Amino acid sequence: LAFFDESKNLKDRQINNIPIFGSFSRLIKLKQQFPDLEVWLAMPSIQTEKRRAIITKLEKIKVAVRTVPSFHELITDKKTMSDIQNLSLDDLLPRTRVERDVVDDSNDKNFLISGAGGSIGSEIVRQLLDSNPCSIILFDISEFNLFRVERECQAIISSKSLSTKIVPILGDIKDSKNLNFLFQQHKVDYVYHAAAYKHVPLVEDTNNIIKACENNVLGTLNLAKVSMENDVESFVMISTDKAVRPTNVMGASKRMAEILIQSLNTHASKTNFSMVRFGNVLNSSGSVIPLFIDQIAKGGPVTLTHKEVTRYFMTIPEASNLVLQASQMADGGEVFILDMGEQVKIYDLARKLIHLSG
């Protein structure tokens, strides 16, 4: 066990007889001496650029990197010292995370999130809870996902002493009768439509094309019409950059849904319709990151379609924050996108994950 710190004041000192090293070359020697060496980063408040520079150095010597909880998390009992975690996915992106404040005017509003149990839907719910809205309707077709997100919401509400009412609803966005009853009963003000079939290879299968289009196109149209009929203030549809000149069924179905939503916005309605296009969302269900992590945990191999393939990436919190911004910024019919910087090589992403996993 050893400490590393670049501060000159700590050079050659000890803490409880444990040496403090300040030279990176010493770390390289330790790696040679102990091949299974792990490095724990105890710098939760360090600037992003400096943190990324340190991680890049550690990546080159192929050590496993973990992070320890912040001092604030420890003293507030949110975490303990046993909560050692892998690196945040933010550390994999070659840019600073994009995050903008969303105006808090939702205390008396009622929200419905379709696909609330999914990776994007559940993060939208978490960010909404920061505003302590009147109610959040968790709408999902998956019983397990709905149970999981509802339980998490109740834990957040309890820990933060919030007054938000959580309403878990099992349902299908194609069921107009059920949706109308739900909207009238709960006086829905905002709809965030995250429910979709989005796994490209699965949707591309000839056995699944019809169901994918029914859900992504007709289901979206149905939910939008019910929202309009019930005077919902804002309807934000989550789309994809694959809807631009689509080359697959998933992208084409999303583009069709976009066109339908934009056509509804031209009608005399109190509902403001808008869309948000996502790039590849890190660690969302079906994305490459969970697949890579699983392959690494099993000892490999890590599989790629091609070494030169590049993609734009965004994190789940970034994607969800963009959805909330869209509902406040939209005048009607817009398509919002996030500036995701430069494209990232999938190969580089996989290599970084492998190196930082030791």
Q: Where are the predicted features?
A:
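NAD(P)-cofactor binding segment of oxidoreductase domains
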Residues: 52-66, 135-142, 184-185, 190, ...
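Conserved Rossmann-fold NAD(P)-dependent oxidoreductase catalytic core, especially the SDR/UDP-sugar
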Residues: 76, 193, 197-258, 263-264
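Conserved beta-loop-beta element that borders a ligand/cofactor-binding pocket
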Residues: 231-234, 260-310, 334-337
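Mid/C-terminal beta-alpha module of Rossmann-like enzyme folds, strongest
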Residues: 329-358
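Conserved Rossmann-fold cofactor-binding substructure of NAD(P)-dependent oxidoreductases
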Residues: 167-190
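Flexible, Lys/Arg-rich cytosolic regulatory linkers and terminal tails that connect or flank
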Residues: 24, 51-110, 228
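N-terminal Rossmann NAD(P)H-binding glycine-rich loop of SDR-like oxidoreductase domains
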Residues: 111-131
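A solvent-exposed beta-alpha-beta segment
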Residues: 1-64, 141-148, 167, 171
